[in-house]
Amino acid sequence: MKNIRNFSIIAHIDHGKSTIADCFIQFCGGLSDREMSSQVLDSMDIEKERGITIKSQSVTLDYHAKNGETYQLNFIDTPGHVDFSYEVSRSLSACEGALLIVDASQGVEAQTVANCYTALEQGLQVVSVLNKIDLPAADPERVMDEIEDVIGVEAHDVVHASAKLGIGIEDILEQIVERIPTPKGNINAPIKALIIDSWFDSYLGVVSLIRMIDGEIKIKTKIKIFSNGGEYIVDEVGIFTPKRKRIDSLKAGEVGFLIANIKNIDGAPVGDTITSAENPASESLEGFRPVQPCVFAGIFPISGKDYEKFRDALAKLRLNDAALQYEPENSDVLGFGFRIGFLGLLHMEIVQERLEREYDLDLIITAPTVIYEILDTKGIIHRVDSLSKMPTNQSISKFREPIITAKILVISKYVGAVMNLCIEKRGIQKNIIYMSRQVSLIYELPLNEVVLDFFDRLKSVSRGFASMDYHFERYQESDLICLDVMINQEPVDALALIMHRDDSVRKGNELVEKMKELIPRQMFDVTIQACIGSKIISRSNVKALRKNVTAKCYGGDVSRKKKLLDKQNKGKKRMRSVGRVDIPKEVFLAILHIN
């Protein structure tokens, strides 16, 4: 065990984490030059295209160090985005050390800080690396100061590297061997292993990536999952090199995979503990919690014929994504679809993109909402994620909304613009810390103001120089209302929104004007109204198309023309009472872009 090193990589999106991982694999001979491709560990197409890591991955490499010994390096590649922070915390708890990679030109970003603090809280040894030192814009001195100021980690022994050119890779590996401690654990104690990640394989069932804490798991060992009590017999254990390689057993301190004929992903939840069914450990590992979605949206197929295909596609995605939760939903306007819960906005985009790309579906997505707490007049608290589940306005006593604490890192030049954005989104400033070049802003913000367009606006007001990390703080009472949209006196359930009363008139007017532009003209007048309960706060009309019925009347008595116009008006009135307005897809997309 003294020659095992377990470590994770902490880095912001696009700071070169997956490229450094590729260099490690090449340097240690995990794959031949012919088998190498860029971003080896990012298995999904969408991961490679967006340049992000979504699922945790692991590789076991043998490194021949300068001191003549051979070390087993177990390296766990983790996601870098705030939506996947639970996966990051579980991956970190499986390690004794972490590699902090910072782009030498961009400097420290908020997500890196959050993950680094998680690592330090868990007692991990942090090894700092400055990547991309070959870039003309690289400023190693400034970034080293930032690492010390913002994160509080010693930066005098930072390794300078360029993964693209292969500079400094051996120095990083030597630092890992020297500075990261050996794993603790007892091979003779009852089995205890942490599930770092699980995914579904259509031939093997659920494959779990595990870190052995105590004991030894062999083929035919009978194991038990702590949280749900499920018992299984192990069919196969092994390691990734990064190819799947079978071995005889996994011992305390090692990281590898386990296959035990588990049929669905809920059978092996991320962060759970595995023990022996015959001789179980007395208690589970700390920190396990079921994954809770915090953003909800309705997704509907454009063609009703695609509903079955959509349902099957969701079931397949769910096999690999335990955080994805869904239930059927029916909308008068959009037909049958599903209400889906996501970890955050990036997670929502990725799920939508995978459904459209991998399963060839055309989908409409409604405005995302969060979970509200509603206290009714009888004192009962309802947790509501959809307007269709709302109690009536008369029975609502109090509205509570989720509040988050956001940490925003921005260069000093754009502080004013970012503060104005936070104020516009009903943010309350809690702290502001000036550092050498960056400023750290701590704000409390309502989550429903963040889910629509906050990230896009933050990037645009800061010219891309701001980054943000957030965590849930509490529920807080707020003056929220339900804004309904009616077309020809018919409420359109899919367009209803929950918002703060102060914003309702402005947003109602914007919504109605936008819809007036987008709804095509009909043979009758179309009335668009925004209302709160029975109070109309905004109204507009889409004028009817009309045929010139008097064109064939030349001269003669005016009563003939009046008779024809009256007949036309009666026809329009009858048409309006029976006619339906088809709302184009663009209207729903426009709602998402209303500020």
Swiss-Prot record:
Record domain tr-type G: where: 2-184
Its membrane topology: Peripheral membrane protein
Cross-referenced SUPFAM superfamilies: EF-G C-terminal domain-like (SSF54980), P-loop containing nucleoside triphosphate hydrolases (SSF52540)
Residue ranges of the TM segments: none
Any one biological process term the GO annotation gives: positive regulation of translation
Chain positions recorded as GTP binding sites: 14-19, 131-134
Protein name, entry field: Elongation factor 4
Reactions it catalyzes: GTP + H2O = GDP + phosphate + H(+)
Function per UniProt: Required for accurate and efficient protein synthesis under certain stress conditions. May act as a fidelity factor of the translation reaction, by catalyzing a one-codon backward translocation of tRNAs on improperly translocated ribosomes. Back-translocation proceeds from a post-translocation (POST) complex to a pre-translocation (PRE) complex, thus giving elongation factor G a second chance to translocate the tRNAs correctly. Binds to ribosomes in a GTP-dependent manner.
PANTHER family: TRANSLATION FACTOR GUF1 HOMOLOG, CHLOROPLASTIC (PTHR43512:SF4), TRANSLATION FACTOR GUF1-RELATED (PTHR43512)
Gene3D superfamilies reported in the protein's UniProt record: 3.30.70.240, Elongation factor 4, C-terminal domain, Elongation Factor G (Translational Gtpase), domain 3, P-loop containing nucleotide triphosphate hydrolases, Translation factors
Enzyme Commission code: 3.6.5.n1
Family classification: Belongs to the TRAFAC class translation factor GTPase superfamily. Classic translation factor GTPase family. LepA subfamily.
GO molecular function: GTP binding; GTPase activity; guanosine tetraphosphate binding; ribosome binding; translation elongation factor activity
Gene (name only): lepA
Species of the source: Vesicomyosocius okutanii subsp. Calyptogena okutanii (strain HA)
